């Protein structure tokens, strides 16, 4: 049960107090930082499946590494999303098949559908996104940029 050097370095960034543990509610952010893309529900399910962690307030790197190993199949599946899977979702809002959606529609999708983001999270995500003169974005480019992060 050994974490990679990169995972240890990222863990250190999350362990702001240098106590060898991170807050349990930071697990999802940590998993995303090391390359997985779990939903909040999956993160909660992973924690709840381990009875020894349900009441814990923090997690050590060894505990997290163990959780990753036990849930490797589910976590790996979260990284398999392809651009085309997301494009299909955006096409529902692209009624004229232009490859673009309005910023308003994008904001609606991100704050109102699926795993909802807050307005502040959407604002952060939209920083640096190229918006054309009609107030629209190229959603394929947007998806690729987000998946690359």
Swiss-Prot record:
Ca(2+) 2 binds at residues 94, 98, 100, 105. Residues 2-37, 81-116, 117-149 form the EF-hand domain. It is found in: Bud neck; Bud tip. Keywords: Calcium, Cell cycle, Cell division, Isopeptide bond, Metal-binding, Motor protein, Myosin, Repeat, Ubl conjugation. There is a cross-link at residue 116 (Glycyl lysine isopeptide (Lys-Gly) (interchain with G-Cter in ubiquitin)). GO terms for cellular component: cellular bud neck; cellular bud neck contractile ring; cellular bud tip; MIH complex; myosin II complex; myosin V complex; plasma membrane; site of polarized growth. One of its GO terms (molecular function) is calcium ion binding. GO terms for biological process: mitotic actomyosin contractile ring assembly; protein localization to cell division site involved in mitotic actomyosin contractile ring assembly; regulation of actomyosin contractile ring contraction; regulation of cell wall organization or biogenesis; regulation of cytokinesis; septum digestion after cytokinesis; vesicle targeting; vesicle transport along actin filament. It comes from the Eukaryota. InterPro entries: CALM/Myosin/TropC-like, EF-hand-dom_pair, EF_hand_dom. This is Myosin light chain 1. It comes from Saccharomyces cerevisiae (strain ATCC 204508 / S288c) (Baker's yeast).
